[in-house]
Amino acid sequence: MKKPLLIFATEGEAAPVRVARPDLDIAICGVGVVESAVSVAKIIESMCPEAVVLCGIAGAYSDALKVGDVVAVSEERCSTLPSVYRKSYLATIKLPLTEVVSNTVMAVGAEAMGAQIENMEGAAIFALCAAYGVPCAEIRTISNYTTDIREQWNIPAALEALVKAVNMLF
């Protein structure tokens, strides 16, 4: 894979990677499905990337994944719509990481739909990349369990693992 455009929801997630890898192209999409969809459409139209890799932190539904684990999302499921309208979106780039299914949610507490992790942007990015014909992948590091209160999240450990994964992959 040629050097992809790395997309992060927040500058806080991107900053450690920017410092470690100033040679990589990085963009910020914002948090949630609406903001990320609008931002990534503009990013794809203006930058015309050959590939996109969404990077960031995620919550795990069970302790089968540990805080700091790095995973590649193979499929995004969106639980925010009634079941008759739900779709799944697939990664089109394979990464040499443990693969998981992710649930894109707009609020904590949405049903897991058979997913191992949840995030707030993945389905939107996968759908946009498919619409534009841009190959895509998603890397997530586990910062918390979905039942944890915010004070229990370990964002520093997750970001450290994310930097290591980016260095290994790109």
Per-range role (PLM):
Residues 14-170:
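Glycine-rich phosphate- or other oxyanion-binding loops that anchor nucleotides, phosphorylated ligands
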Residues 1-5:
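Extreme N-terminal starter segment of soluble prokaryotic enzymes
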Residues 9:
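Internal glycine-rich, Lys/Arg-flanked active-site/core loops of soluble domains
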